[in-house]
């Protein structure tokens, strides 16, 4: 019985302590933090006070989070459409997401990354023909679309592919 009481007392952290503990593992958006704290059983008042504390001290900053997320996503070969969608799923406002993408991502970069991904997809295909078939072009286009590249960047990349 004593062990159970000690375990319960040990598990229940203050809302701020729980938030700071979770932030040790990485940056979070405001939405992610609120959801986490609700899941842990904290009430709305505690969460509101905690969020004000975290935002005031810049422990949570959706602008900073969005910029880092865009950088990492670009390195992974994701396009701006997918990046925007993923940021919005994480609770980052559309304006903040668009601003972060515009700051780090430009049209030239998108076209270059799309071409790199298309070339990688082409290397993975075992084709002996000199020209790309329509079927191969469609397969590459689907891959680029799934990665979040615009139609313009996709068509440009396919047009620039060398066989």
Indicate where each model-derived feature is located.
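An alpha-helical, amphipathic repeat domain used for nucleic-acid recognition
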Residues: 1-163
């Amino acid at each position: 019985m004593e062990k159970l009481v000690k375990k319960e007392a040990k598990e229940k952290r203050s809302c701020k302590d729980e938030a700071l503990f979770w932030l040790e593992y990485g940056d979070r958006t405001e939405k992610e933090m609120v959801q986490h704290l609700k899941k842990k059983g904290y009430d709305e008042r505690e969460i509101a006070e905690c969020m004000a504390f975290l935002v005031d001290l810049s422990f949570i900053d959706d602008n900073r989070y969005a910029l880092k997320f865009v950088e990492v996503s670009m390195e992974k070969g994701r396009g701006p459409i997918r990046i925007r969608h993923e940021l919005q799923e994480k609770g980052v406002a559309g304006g903040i997401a668009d601003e972060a993408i515009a700051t780090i991502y430009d049209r030239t970069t998108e076209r270059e990354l799309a071409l790199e991904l298309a070339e990688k997809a082409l290397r993975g295909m075992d084709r002996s023909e000199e020209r790309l078939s329509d079927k191969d072009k469609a397969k590459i286009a689907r891959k680029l679309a799934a990665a979040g590249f615009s139609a313009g960047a996709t068509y440009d990349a396919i047009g620039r592919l060398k066989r």
